[in-house]
């Protein structure tokens, strides 16, 4: 594959991608803002920079054949809209332009299923060719849609080929930064998650499957194309049941209805902002949980050889990893 450079290596998907590239023996450079012990012992090169600082990208991308762009901000609580836009949109534009200037052959961009407007009546959703932020809700979805369209439009310019992969809700190991799902697992471990949620469902995918799909996209993805990288859709209640079972915990007896969640969400949003903690429930996330999540991965299976693991295995691996990670932090 030649020289690979990747952004977002400290993230949930990014770290899994780094391990996948190294396991395949790829010459890999990671773009990071500062040193981190999570890279200790890994055979990768480091370039220091930031996607919102374009002058740092050209030096990092020099001589690269493939760039994987997974850096981004997933923000559920309100108040950080400018940061989200700057990283997700401007940062992606900076990456694209640096790829062109440096003669990069292929860019693989990590988009999201959130860029899709939900279809009614649980209709199956397949890949689309145009992404419009104005018909979406939430700053994350809007910024990822705008960035995705920019990457599509960049395909074929200045010798650059672009491929986009679009994961659903990511689970699995390597949750160093504590995602919303990871926060829930940590609360279950501590016995601080007292309720079973009686509404909503979502589509989940393991970060290791996303990483494999990203590499496959670089190797055989069609230029200018998007690929939905999703797994199983299960109810939130089933997710909690599988998580508690994986950790040997009892399933909570208290039930949280959508009505109660709707009532509590505005209060919780203030709490998350004041305490600067990872949000579990916001008004936006509740709406997402009750919207259509019936995504098809048929195209990725056919063209990329995508074959995701079961959600139960992924949840178990995530729970085991978080349990070990938190225990080691206390030593």
Name each region found by the language model.
Residues 213-279, 297, 302, 310-331:
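Mid/C-terminal beta-alpha module of Rossmann-like enzyme folds, strongest
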């Amino acid at each position: 594959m030649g020289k690979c450079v990747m952004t977002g290596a400290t993230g949930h998907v990014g770290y899994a991608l780094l391990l996948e590239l190294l396991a395949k023996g790829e010459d890999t450079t990671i773009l990071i803002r500062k040193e981190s012990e999570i890279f200790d012992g890994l055979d990768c090169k480091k370039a220091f920079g930031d996607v919102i600082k374009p002058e740092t990208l050209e030096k990092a991308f020099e001589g690269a054949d493939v760039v994987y762009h997974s850096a981004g901000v997933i923000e559920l609580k309100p108040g950080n809209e400018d940061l989200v836009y700057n990283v997700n949109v401007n940062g992606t534009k900076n990456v694209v332009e640096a790829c062109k200037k440096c003669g990069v052959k292929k860019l693989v961009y990590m988009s999201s299923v959130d860029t899709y407007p939900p279809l009614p009546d649980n209709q199956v959703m397949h890949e689309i060719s145009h992404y419009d932020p104005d018909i979406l809700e939430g700053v994350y979805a809007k910024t990822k849609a705008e960035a995705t369209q920019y990457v599509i439009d960049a395909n074929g310019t200045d010798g650059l080929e672009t491929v986009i992969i679009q994961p659903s809700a990511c689970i699995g190991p390597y949750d160093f930064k504590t995602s919303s799902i990871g926060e829930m697992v940590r609360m279950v471990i501590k016995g601080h998650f007292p309720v079973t949620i009686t509404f909503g469902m979502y589509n989940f995918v393991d970060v290791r499957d996303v990483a494999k799909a990203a590499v496959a996209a670089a190797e055989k993805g069609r230029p200018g194309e998007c690929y939905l990288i999703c797994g199983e859709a299960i109810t939130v209640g089933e997710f909690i049941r599988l998580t508690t079972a994986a950790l040997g915990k009892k399933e909570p007896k208290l039930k949280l209805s959508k009505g109660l969640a709707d009532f509590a969400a505005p209060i919780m949003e203030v709490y998350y902002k004041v305490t600067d903690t990872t949000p579990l429930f916001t008004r936006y996330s509740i709406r997402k949980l009750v919207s259509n999540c019936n995504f098809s991965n048929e195209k990725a299976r056919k063209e990329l050889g995508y074959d995701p693991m079961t959600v139960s295995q992924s949840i178990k691996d995530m729970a085991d990893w978080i349990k070990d990670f938190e225990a080691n932090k206390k030593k």
